[in-house]
């Protein structure tokens, strides 16, 4: 069976894969393979200062060890900078973006919502971030797990950064351009990115790009409430007995794997997942405590 479905897993090489990463990878992989779709891997290496040496290689080796097979070559955002620059120039020329010289200290009292200080200031681009003007509109979409999501861009976000002051490109711009370039039809990722999606919908609309379907899976959190992640030194996935964490990941996604699946191979665990995948079983919640799995 084949389909037009194109999914992707897009890790950031600021550390190694951990259990939270695995849950997102399993969800995106099974959602694609269950319908005969393609599954791509993309390195989101936008921020060289934060990249851990050797992490890209380690991530790919872990995916292979855990039985994942991707289609085509691994793409890297660091090779796409000219495409991002071209779109930023286009947005600046059309007046849809502008230079912003605000410091973090100037903005610290605004709870992450940009107040528009530089919107009409006409600053030069030197030593400035680039922000995208947002409309006073509410954006809605229906997530396949989390249901309807609404966000008023003007009131809840404000004009947002698409290129940082240090010249590095922002995630919101890069992810939209790369998903369109790769023909991604379905985005399956962690629920921490749920509130980024309306910004991405706006960019897609602005640039005339097609809108993919979205599915946001619960984040795995530690007892203190922090999500599993590189910032909190979550342990990397074990090199051996990959079927054990794979089976736990299936349970985190609401699937019902037999206990003996953990005693087999990684390939067997993923094959079971593909054959029995049911996205409607994924818990409709933003987080899941790791100790409950």
Swiss-Prot record:
What keywords are assigned to this protein? Aminoacyl-tRNA synthetase, ATP-binding, Ligase, Metal-binding, Nucleotide-binding, Zinc
A Pfam family per the record: tRNA-synt_1c
- An example of a Gene Ontology BP annotation on this entry? tRNA modification
In terms of InterPro entries, this protein maps to: Glu-Q_tRNA(Asp)_Synthase, Glu/Gln-tRNA-synth, Glu/Gln-tRNA-synth_Ib_cat-dom, GluQ/Sye, Rossmann-like_a/b/a_fold
Per UniProt, the short sequence motif 'KMSKS' region occupies residue numbers 227-231
Q: Where does Zn(2+) bind?
A: 100, 102, 114, 118
Q: What class of enzyme is it?
A: ligase
Which GO MF terms does the UniProt record name?
Answer: ATP binding; glutamate-tRNA ligase activity; zinc ion binding
| Binding-site residues for ATP, renumbered to this chain | 230
Q: What is its EC number?
A: 6.1.1.-
Please share the entry's free-text remark on the cofactor. Binds 1 zinc ion per subunit.
Query: What stretch of residues is annotated with the motif 'HIGH' region?
Result: 11-21
**Cofactor(s) for this protein?**
Zn(2+)
What residues bind L-glutamate, as annotated?
8-12, 44, 171, 189
The record's Gene Ontology cellular component field reads: cytosol
Q: What does this protein do?
A: Catalyzes the tRNA-independent activation of glutamate in presence of ATP and the subsequent transfer of glutamate onto a tRNA(Asp). Glutamate is transferred on the 2-amino-5-(4,5-dihydroxy-2-cyclopenten-1-yl) moiety of the queuosine in the wobble position of the QUC anticodon.
Per the record, the similarity remark reads:
Belongs to the class-I aminoacyl-tRNA synthetase family. GluQ subfamily.
This chain belongs to which protein, by name?
Glutamyl-Q tRNA(Asp) synthetase
Please tell me the species this chain comes from.
Pseudomonas paraeruginosa (strain DSM 24068 / PA7)
What taxonomic classification does the UniProt entry list for its organism?
Answer: Bacteria, Pseudomonadati, Pseudomonadota, Gammaproteobacteria, Pseudomonadales
Encoding gene, per UniProt annotation = gluQ
